[in-house]
Amino acid sequence: MTKITVFGMGSFGTALANVLAENGHDVLMWGKNQDAVDELNTCHTNKKYLKYAKLDVNIIATSDMTKAIQFADIYLMALPTKAMREVASQINDKLTSKKTFIHVAKGIENGTFKRVSEMIEDSISPEYNAGIGVLSGPSHAEEVVVKQPTTVAASSKDKSVSKLTQDLFMNDYLRVYTNDDLIGVELGGALKNIIAVASGIVAGIGYGDNAKAALMTRGLAEISRLGEKLGADPMTFLGLGGIGDLIVTCTSTHSRNFTLGYKLGQGESMDQALSEMNMVVEGIYTTKSVYHLAKEKNVDMPITNALYRVLFENISVKECVKDLMERDKKSE
């Protein structure tokens, strides 16, 4: 039995906390919202994010950062990318011993263009860092929490962290593979959110299967181009952390990125769509980061560029689709 602190009480953090508890581990969840903490401790639910799920009664929650830090030597960082650096820094200020960090965020930091493991590494003093890894792949929280068969990848620069992650999470409904390509697994998880928003737009407009298939295929091509430029193994993008995550996020209404895109395709403004969803949509922030990163690295990413124009330059969806279709002739 292992003690694990889960930082973040969103949908995926909650679903994975449930997996860990059912696997026999001691789990403490940390969140800022006292009402959510009280609900979990009293009712064993988190209805804001997982409306109908009844959680393992052994999961406990707290809003006390010091208590959360002292509880365990393994931390599951289940926070939005934009909150990761701040919370990791707060954790670092209170650490007195080495900890292992496993994150499940799928984004690229605005401004620095850093992957989430790099953000954590920046924030945690070396004397307190026992290793950093990621758990990623096609894994909707809504399915994990009701024990639908799910398969994901665990990766780290340190193979022992990947193996630890595999051992902690794997059971008869969650299969975990290890993968040595941390860069590729993190980039696959982050970049597919861009394509998922675009895929939602295509569905919202009412375009057919031809357009959806083309978008995912060409989206994977530009993900691979940038990934290879940044040091990833292109083969990673043909695995769970790449095309696996891409397919599930581009085809399901469980995906908040797809849902945002669908609403935009239906003619809603971004503010209107986000107000209805009341959830963090990583694809917005990732699009901004990757648009500028691709320009800096001189990588051609036409779908990302088009989505950036829709999200941040108020260009119409149909105009961007027209521009994509009328680009110069190219070889695949």
Curated annotation (Swiss-Prot):
Gene3D superfamilies: N-(1-d-carboxylethyl)-l-norvaline Dehydrogenase, domain 2, NAD(P)-binding Rossmann-like Domain
Places the protein is found: Cytoplasm
Pathway the protein contributes to: Membrane lipid metabolism; glycerophospholipid metabolism
GO cellular component: cytosol
Entry GO MF terms: glycerol-3-phosphate dehydrogenase [NAD(P)+] activity; NAD binding
UniProt xrefs under SUPFAM superfamilies: 6-phosphogluconate dehydrogenase C-terminal domain-like, NAD(P)-binding Rossmann-fold domains
Active site: residue positions: K192
Binding site for NADPH: S11, F12, K32, K106, A141, R256, V280, E282
EC numbers on record: 1.1.1.94
GO biological process, one term: glycerol-3-phosphate biosynthetic process
Main location, first listed in the record: cytoplasm
Domain of life (superkingdom): Bacteria
InterPro entries: 6-PGluconate_DH-like_C_sf, 6PGD_dom2, G3P_DH_NAD-dep, G3P_DH_NAD-dep_C, G3P_DH_NAD-dep_N, NAD(P)-bd_dom_sf
Residues at which sn-glycerol 3-phosphate binds: K106, G137, S139, K192, D245, S255, R256, N257
Range of residues in the leader sequence: none
Keyword Iron applies: no
Function of the protein: Catalyzes the reduction of the glycolytic intermediate dihydroxyacetone phosphate (DHAP) to sn-glycerol 3-phosphate (G3P), the key precursor for phospholipid synthesis.
Protein name (Swiss-Prot/TrEMBL): Glycerol-3-phosphate dehydrogenase [NAD(P)+]
Organism (species): Staphylococcus aureus (strain NCTC 8325 / PS 47)
Gene: gpsA
